[in-house]
Amino acid sequence: MGRIRGLEAPTTPIRLCPLCGEPSAFDEITEFYYCNHCDQFIQWLPDSYTMMMTGPPGAGKTPVLHHWMDFYARNGRPSVFLAFDDSPANLRGPLGGYTHEKLSEYEGHGLITLVDCYSSIAGVSGREKYALKNRADLNELSLLITDLLNAMTSLGSPKIMLDSATPLFTYKEPQLVVQFLSTMAAKVKSRGGAFLTSLASGTVSEENVRRLQTIMDFAVELRILEVEGRQKRQVRLAKARGQRVYEEWIPIYIGKEAISIDVGDDPAKYERLRKAFESPS
């Protein structure tokens, strides 16, 4: 029996990504059109930079870093993920989604390295090749980052990701943590790499947040809004050294395999964002 005219299920309009021209996917739960064909603004970042990413718990800081690790691995640039907020064993599942089940391959080639900076809090030994014995020891952390930086530089521009710096502020005086992050950021960038750190908003004083923003080339903020009973996530570029900041809050989709932003159908808006991410001075 044919379908009765007028009772057909509504179809979702096709929408093309303004960057790559491919059809966007549609998430019915979040009602978000997202692109899973191109890398969007991550491809505009320079190889060598420093960045701080802030936002409340659940805003998507860790998934964004996981997504970027996949981008860098696909392009032959090694990433080191210093896991302070959870054990690598718990991160491998979500990270496997963003790497499209190539995580083991990337780890085998040295393109992704997970460092256990979490297990020591429970007094147990981590199973990772690299792990901190005392996650409150900034000297140990500094030596470990330096060793990893030396090992990874031969593979390409290394990306050091510290997720997150929040626990460090609970163990040490804020000025010591700020000084440590400043030193590490400068060291990694001087070796042609990138240093990225996340921070839970509301856990550190605004003064120290501003000090960290001053240190970093880029400052990215994430937030969660409640809209008609649904959570909506947004992102904005709060600082870009040497460039005019793209000041608007941008809707962002955080999926299990893809992350995508939406600034509308006007390519000129994406061009403004691209210029904001141009190489910092």
Briefly describe each language-model feature range.
Residues I14, F32:
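Residues immediately within or flanking Cys/His clusters that coordinate Zn2+
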Residues C17-C20, C35-C38:
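Short cysteine-rich clusters marking metal-coordination/redox-active sites
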Residues F26-D27, W44:
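Short, non-ligating residues that shape and space the ligands of small metal-coordination modules
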Residues W44-G108, I112-D116:
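Walker A/P-loop NTP-binding active-site region of P-loop NTPases
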Residues P78, G110-L111, G156-K159, S190-S198:
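Loop/turn-to-beta-strand initiation segments
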Residues S120-T183, K189:
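Phosphate-binding/switch loop-helix module in NTP-utilizing enzymes
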Residues G193, S198-E257:
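Phosphate-binding/switch region of NTP-binding enzymes
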Residues R244-S281:
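C-terminal regions of RecA-like/P-loop NTPase motor modules
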